[in-house]
Amino acid sequence: IAAMGGEAVANGDDVSDWEGAQAMVNQAIETFGDLTGIVSNAGILRDRMLVNMTEAEWDAVIQVHLKGTFAPARWAAAYWRDKAKAGEEVNASIVNTTSVSGIYGNPGQTNYGAAKMGIAAFTIIAAREMQRYGVRVNAVAPGALTRMTEDLGMGQASEEDKALMHPRYIAPIVTWLQSAESSDVTGRV
């Protein structure tokens, strides 16, 4: 990021940890003087058919995906609400990552699909709640080929299809949703 002229700060907190999420948001505000957006993109897989899934596998996926979306958003939302109530202009954005698996389902992913569908609902409701404070909330549902999805059979796709699933096609959408150009877009999945 710095090599490309940007600024960045590392943070090793767990997005699903309440205090860690608060520390993450506070670190961004203290480092950069403000917070204008967050992107929730943490994820894990613990795939198993429903009859074989353990409680720990269910809980781990729900914790990272759903609580890991909620906790940072909650602390950022409180910051933006306080700014708006103080009369300051807020033009902020939350972009969450859901999945086509959460929308259409995928065998062996009841935990993952439930978490991702939960993120979709969270996005729509949070958008309605936060719009009055100048905050947009949207989600992307990529079908990208990553290290995490290679083992799901996506790695078996043709080279042409693999090229189309490259994550580089998702970043411009997320960047646009974080920009002022998308100021009239909220509550979209």
Where are these regions (language model features)?
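A glycine-rich helix->loop->beta "capping" turn
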Residues: 4-7, 27-40, 46, 89, ...
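Substrate-binding pocket helix/loop in short-chain dehydrogenase/reductase
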Residues: 49-50, 57-62
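Active-site helix of classical SDR
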Residues: 73, 115
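Residue(s) in the substrate-gating loop at a strand-loop-helix junction
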Residues: 99
